[in-house]
């Protein structure tokens, strides 16, 4: 017996014929065709002819249009987007109608492709087999077109080229979305926040930010997502699949976005530039989020506490503060994190990976933020300026601390002696005077430090390493701050000026010591005799009297002294 073809069970009407049908006849037609589609879907029909497959899809789409009574009667055919049969035009899809029903669980779908995907969720049941398998990564596909599209992710082929800017794309849909960025057309507007989007699918995904809907759930860990692409990427964290490889170094990634971000380390390409400050980005979405820094726009508000955010990922991470969720767990030490970037940086503590390398001096960093900050030591860039005095800084935190000099704010108070400090670093350094303890200890001499960076700088006093060299005179230094201060001896810059007498200083320590001459403050007190000093160096010299330390030796006769003034006085005896 011959197999039944699609054309044997389908029925078509011309536009004129359809107009002559009574409402009851139209309803009967719709019921029959719906039943036909259900039957074809349930037997798992495989389409040998791609034209028939396309016809099946078009018929399915247009059947949904006929499920309502709104037909294109009395309208020009050119106004209609889809054709049900060669001569019959119809209106848009009727909302809420889902003619494709799963025979296993009864769930219904708008599209046959959606039903196909769903059927695979039932173990051991496939609506269509997947005859097209990728040789690169092993992924299989039901349709040849889908397989051919996937292959481009490996070959790098981008057949869709924008005539406006020359940008190329692997897939047609992102290409269409990109074209709309040139014409500025964004016909789909969110009723909640007014945001306009270029396509209806983007609007549907965006609306889930407001509703909180996350229809895509991971079967492995139960985590839910608002869009299908996110769950596909997430599932790779369980399977270990990394289909996107860097052509430069071979490193593999779970998402296309990740490999593009990584490629910056090789080529530095950032095509999207901010008109306000000139900062460049890899993706237009990153630029849009950045632009909100200038506009002050924060469209995402937390329903729990009312805090607003510039981007959707920030609010998602913030909400975990309320829920306590920490989905990223380190396999090495068990520590959990609420945000993926923090988790990735933490993992590098175990692996020792430092992917961001400075081209100037070769120093490597585990975080891109540390790398960018370090680059400023070479360029001399100081983008953060104090509006009060005009002083500029490399880092935003330094500016924040500096501002306290103007406001007088000292938020860090010592519980031992009630002394207050403008910065956490100064406070921690002070606490050592009480406890004598620090978390980072030098293996050579036992000296303790609050910060690992301070320990590294100190260790150079033992190794003799001086990686920072002055280009003017060739003098080398163990610490980046030392070379910055040293450069002022060449430029003549004296940024620390006394408001009392106008005297200016190169070094902040000299300036602070000078200011105590005006205030009378003497913070360094000798425990032996109670004598107080305004300068730490003076205090150190004084303590040598009590412990009989005499580190300064005369090269002529070998006599030792505790003070440099005493040594100088002694030297005059030899010079007579």
UniProtKB/Swiss-Prot annotation:
MF terms (GO), sorted A to Z: DNA-binding transcription factor activity; RNA polymerase II cis-regulatory region sequence-specific DNA binding; zinc ion binding
Lineage: Eukaryota, Metazoa, Chordata, Craniata, Vertebrata
Subcellular location: Nucleus
GO biological process terms held by the UniProt record: regulation of transcription by RNA polymerase II
Recorded family membership: Belongs to the krueppel C2H2-type zinc-finger protein family.
Gene: ZNF791
Descriptive protein name: Zinc finger protein 791
Zinc fingers classed as C2H2-type: ranges: 100-122, 132-154, 160-182, 188-210, 216-238, 244-266, 272-294, 300-322, 328-350, 356-378, 384-406, 412-434, 440-462, 468-490, 496-518, 524-546, 552-574
A Pfam family matched in the record: zf-C2H2
